Amino acid sequence: MDRVEEFTGRRVFYVEGVPDPTGGWAGFFAGHFRALREDAWRCADEQHVRTCPQYDAIVVGLPQYVFYGDTRNPIINLLAATTVARAWRGKPLLRPGGAMVLITACDGHIDPDLHPSYREALRLFAATRRAGAVEAHFERLRAQPRYLDMYRNHHAYHPVHPLWLLNESQYVLEQAGLLVFASGERNEGVEAVGATYAADFRRAWDMVLAHCGPSPRTLVLPSYFSLVPMVFDVDATRR
């Protein structure tokens, strides 16, 4: 905004709206952007920042659609896990080596019309569970004629779109010692993204207890993706 004012030679009158967690409005702020910034950010923090300890385990419920598509898609599930695990400041929300459980309808289906390059990217990723293995094929994926045609003429995602998602999702695979997709259907896509399948939550919870020990400190987020996202201010010394 400083550059805008420098270019125009005028002060900018700015209006900022802060949503509440349900998608309504918590407040509106108007004036010069510097003058309203502190009050607007304080309001946003009051609405969306939660102070909490660090957790041994996190359980998250997924809706049918989130971000870029259907949660039947294993890459979309991995991105959802990463989004929650990265929503922190101070210290990581999930302790190193902790466990995450997604309650999801993931059955391995990848929409070939919307995400034509995802299945190939997932196959490349599965070999090492490292995004770099897919990046090595960047130019080939980017220039693949069928993928480009789908992107340019049929409303599909860009051929290299899954590379971006796998890159950022590397975080949860490195932070969590156990990632479980519970419910849905057993499918090879779950293992390909580095997760473990459980037929239901009871079986998933047994895996968590075996991994973390009895009475793990657990954060349960049944409707995280149905609300305006939260940020967790983590105090790792808090008990």
Segments predicted by a language model, with ranges:
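Short glycine/threonine-rich loop-to-helix capping motif typified by GTGT followed
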Residues: 27-28, 68-77, 110-122, 192-193, ...
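C-terminal catalytic subdomain
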Residues: 78-179
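Conserved, well-structured core segments that form the ligand-binding/active-site neighborhood
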Residues: 1-56, 61-64, 81-94
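Structural motif
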Residues: 56-61, 101, 219-220
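Extended hydrophobic packing segments that form well-structured cores
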Residues: 167-239
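Acidic/glycine-enriched edge-of-secondary-structure segments
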Residues: 23-35, 68-74, 151-154, 182-195
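N-terminal glycine-/serine-/threonine-rich phosphate-binding loop
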Residues: 74, 80-81, 199-202
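Short, glycine-/Ser/Thr-/acidic-enriched flexible segments
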Residues: 20, 63-66, 106-109, 185-187, ...
